[in-house]
């Protein structure tokens, strides 16, 4: 429920604060005082596009701030609203209320705030649109649109779950159809790609490269290319360390020399020399190890150049792969892994195509059944809704009016991308909201031809149709009880007894909802629980909002009664109208 609204520098309103209660609140005022700015402010809180031209002349920005409570709402609605607050980081005030604010800058971007936290306008509307239902003359025009008519019928029918199930199946069906078409169109391309991948993997598997093999080959080839030089260097070094095989010269080797030196030092009684003997012994150990390693190195060296030729041939094989698939062998192996994964995804078999065709057919059947189920729900609800709206119109001084709702299957051409064959044999167009075309019909006098609402209702008649529809939706609990319903001059083009009946219907609606109405009709204003008047407060044309007392209400109603003003007859007429309305039992 909206408990307070503060407007600053919006249109004709300089600064105004209005407090709202449960029940029926009416706003009146002379033309040009800014009554509609109150509704405009609520539209802004509902996420409407910010218009800098709405900022009052001389001001830098306009601000609209609303305070909402959720105590009168059902648990499910409160839980949904709390989820919006939590996701936005918004907080409630100490009394549990929530402040929503919209700021419009003359030169910069607009700002939105919810519970003290800056939020996108979409997040703000996600909260306020659950609490506010706004209706104006533009909304009457929207009621002529087929999608709005279908939406109203679905609300009455409580068709939300059926619509969601249909949409889920439709998305799956469209995805499967796209996959099937893509599969058929790309079958040859996929087969060619699979052949290329198989050829490449076979080539790689035949060569059988090992991780890092190309790097190791470079080192091996470099070593084998200098085989004679390496053998000579190793042989010379070994001979120098251990001596030549000639027994007469064997004592010239480093091993023998170090052995003799160590023995000489060990034979001494001098401690220093014996310490040096240990160092020479360590050197001897190192030299002996080096001699052994040089021997092993020489044993491993190929006896001829055939080993080099084998390494070069292997390098040529690997280079064939690195020229085609990657810069090095490790990259080739990664490419092969990716190719195997891709090949596993490429199902080019006839079995795969047939399975996809079966799945698409199954989804089409399920979707067709869901569409029929949704149509059945709508057709049943259409009869009840049309009957109840016609009854409301009768109570609004339109006893001969007839309101109808047509629900027909929207047929499709064979070339339509969303054509769906139904069990009945019809080829329907599977739109986002079903296969149904919903059309509201209206005739002011029974016996005449019923025409589409857009072609048959005048402004005043359209106002009453819309009000009747809202009353039916609200009283059948398709609108959450405790929410706020705002009507901006939907009584345009209406007067007399019809205006009285509109007032009565709005008062009845206020039993379960907070109802706020901007009106120029005294018959409607007389039924309100609270009467607010928008009036000019200064010479600069600024306007404010004032709550009227009982006597003030009489004076305002007298003004609204054809400008009778402060005349005795005007006041008497206004007082009688007010007393009659307030004492109406609203049966």
From Swiss-Prot:
GO biological process, one term: DNA recombination
CC per GO annotation: bacterial nucleoid; peptidoglycan-based cell wall
A single GO molecular function term of this UniProt record: ATP binding
Assigned keywords, A-Z: ATP-binding, DNA damage, DNA repair, Nucleotide-binding
InterPro entries: DNA_recomb/repair_RecN, P-loop_NTPase, RecF/RecN/SMC_N
Top-level taxon of the source organism: Bacteria
CDD domains, sorted: ABC_RecN (cd03241)
Keyword Transit peptide among record annotations: no
Binding site for ATP: 29-36
Family affiliation: Belongs to the RecN family.
Function: May be involved in recombinational repair of damaged DNA.
Protein name: DNA repair protein RecN
Organism field: Mycobacterium tuberculosis (strain ATCC 25618 / H37Rv)
Annotated gene: recN
């Amino acid at each position: 429920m909206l408990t307070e609204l503060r407007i600053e520098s919006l249109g004709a309103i300089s600064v105004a604060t209005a407090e709202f209660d449960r029940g029926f609140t009416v706003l009146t005022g002379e033309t040009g005082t800014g009554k509609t700015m109150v509704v405009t402010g609520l539209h802004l809180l509902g996420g409407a596009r910010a218009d800098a031209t709405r900022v009052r002349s001389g001001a830098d920005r306009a601000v609209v701030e609303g305070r909402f409570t959720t105590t009168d709402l059902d648990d499910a609605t409160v839980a949904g609203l709390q989820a919006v607050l939590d996701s936005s980081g918004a907080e409630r005030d100490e009394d549990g209320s929530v402040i929503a604010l919209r700021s419009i800058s003359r030169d910069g971007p607009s700002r939105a705030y919810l519970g003290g936290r800056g939020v996108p306008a979409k997040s703000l509307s996600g909260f306020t649109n659950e609490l506010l239902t706004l209706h104006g003359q533009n909304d009457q025009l929207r009621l002529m649109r087929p999608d709005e008519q279908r939406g109203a019928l679905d609300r009455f029918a409580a068709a939300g779950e059926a619509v969601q199930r249909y949409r889920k199946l439709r998305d799956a069906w469209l995805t499967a159809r796209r996959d099937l078409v893509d599969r058929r169109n790309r079958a040859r391309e996929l087969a060619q790609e699979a052949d290329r991948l198989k050829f490449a993997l076979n080539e790689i598997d035949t060569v059988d490269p090992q991780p890092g093999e190309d790097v190791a080959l470079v080192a091996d080839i470099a070593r084998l290319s200098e085989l004679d030089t390496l053998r000579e260097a190793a042989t010379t070094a070994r001979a120098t360390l251990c001596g030549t095989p000639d027994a007469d010269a064997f004592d010239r080797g480093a091993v023998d020399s170090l052995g003799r030196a160590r023995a000489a030092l060990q034979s001494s009684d001098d401690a220093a020399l014996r310490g040096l003997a240990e160092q020479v012994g360590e050197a001897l150990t190192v030299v002996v190890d080096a001699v052994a390693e040089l021997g092993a190195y020489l044993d491993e060296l190929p006896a001829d150049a055939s080993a080099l030729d084998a390494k070069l041939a292997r390098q040529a094989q690997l280079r064939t792969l690195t020229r085609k698939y990657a810069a090095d062998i490790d990259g080739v192996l990664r490419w092969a892994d990716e190719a195997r994964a891709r090949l596993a995804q490429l199902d080019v078999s006839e079995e795969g195509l047939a399975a996809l065709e079966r799945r698409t057919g199954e989804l089409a059947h399920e979707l067709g059944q869901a569409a029929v189920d949704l149509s059945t729900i709508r057709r049943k609800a259409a009869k009840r809704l049309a009957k109840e709206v016609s009854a409301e119109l009768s109570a609004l001084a339109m006893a001969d009016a007839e309101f109808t709702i047509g629900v027909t299957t929207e047929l499709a051409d064979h070339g339509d991308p969303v054509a769906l064959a139904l069990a009945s044999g019809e080829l329907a167009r599977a739109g986002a909201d079903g296969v149904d075309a919903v059309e509201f019909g209206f005739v002011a006098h029974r016996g005449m031809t019923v025409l589409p609402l857009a072609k048959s209702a005048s402004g005043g008649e359209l106002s009453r149709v819309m009000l009747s529809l809202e009353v039916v939706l609200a009283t059948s609990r398709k609108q959450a009880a405790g929410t706020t319903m705002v009507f901006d001059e939907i009584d345009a083009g209406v007067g007399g007894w019809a205006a009285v009946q509109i007032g009565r219907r709005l008062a009845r609606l206020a039993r379960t909802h907070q109802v706020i109405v901007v009106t120029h009709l005294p018959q409607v204003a007389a039924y309100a629980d609270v009467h607010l008047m928008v009036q000019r407060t200064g010479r600069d044309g600024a306007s404010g909002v004032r709550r009227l007392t009982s006597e003030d209400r009489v004076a305002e109603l007298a003004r609204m009664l054809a400008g009778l003003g402060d005349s005795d007859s005007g006041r008497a007429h206004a007082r009688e109208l007010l007393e009659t309305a307030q004492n109406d039992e609203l049966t």
